[in-house]
């Protein structure tokens, strides 16, 4: 006899689902309320990029997100935002450079580098961005490369960036897969790419071991209505 026996007659047993890329802040909910909605649909692990709160509060905002989820019954991980501020000419609450990011490396729950939105910076060897890629070179590097293809995509992939969640068509996703980038199929509130991509996956009988699902940005009302 085990310490706890569960009668699973006529029930399904599934592993917990993983939301591989999301931004809690865009739901306009606190971490505990957002996580409760995800848990209700069987999601037990969140991989987040808290760049919204980081744009306002810097490292303190990221540390808050980690601390606010520490006692929750969910596995919560952070990809440190790579583009704070989002563009060089913006006035944000802080500038999150490689030196500031280094302070977060030892924190429990920090996995790697958040979505690298500065595609021109990667392709043109921007020194500040290369310093961030170097800092996280032994960790997971998330990408953000909408409609990128050809030699530019090859250059982006050569930087070590491993994932992308911005594909809106199967042809785009397939080219990125062939470049060695894992595809996170996005089905959120603003962007819904599942139908377009999954048809190609099924039609081409693709090996899906380098594919996963994510929401990116999804509102609580949508999660309650249709799941995550």
Where are these regions (language model features)?
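Divalent metal-coordination and catalytic microenvironments
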Residues: 10, 21, 42, 65, ...
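Active-site mouth loops of central-metabolism enzymes
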Residues: 18-31, 85-99, 159-166
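A cross-domain feature marking catalytic cores of carbohydrate-active enzymes
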Residues: 22-24, 49-50, 78-82, 115, ...
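Divalent-metal coordination cores built from histidine and acidic residues
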Residues: 32-140
């Amino acid at each position: 006899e085990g310490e706890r026996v569960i009668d699973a007659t006529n029930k399904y047993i599934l592993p917990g689902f993983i939301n591989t890329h999301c931004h809690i802040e865009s739901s306009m909910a606190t971490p505990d309320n957002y996580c409760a909605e995800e848990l209700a649909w069987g999601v037990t692990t969140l991989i987040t990029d808290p760049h919204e709160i980081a744009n306002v509060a810097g490292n303190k905002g990221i540390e808050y997100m980690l601390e606010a989820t520490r006692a929750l019954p969910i596995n919560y991980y952070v990809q440190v935002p790579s583009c704070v501020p989002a563009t060089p000419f913006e006035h944000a609450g802080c500038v999150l450079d490689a030196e500031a990011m280094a302070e977060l490396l030892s924190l429990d729950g920090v996995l790697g580098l958040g979505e690298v939105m500065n595609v021109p910076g990667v392709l043109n060897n921007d020194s500040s961005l290369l310093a961030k890629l170097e800092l996280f070179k032994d960790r997971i590097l998330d990408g953000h490369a909408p409609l990128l293809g050809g030699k530019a995509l090859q250059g982006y992939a050569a930087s070590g960036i491993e994932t992308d969640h911005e594909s809106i068509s199967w042809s785009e996703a397939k080219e990125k897969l062939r470049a060695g980038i894992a595809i996170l199929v996005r089905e959120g509130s603003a962007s819904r790419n599942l139908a377009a991509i999954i048809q190609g996956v099924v039609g081409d009988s693709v090996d899906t071991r380098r594919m996963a699902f994510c929401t990116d940005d999804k509102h609580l009302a949508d999660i309650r209505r249709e799941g995550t």
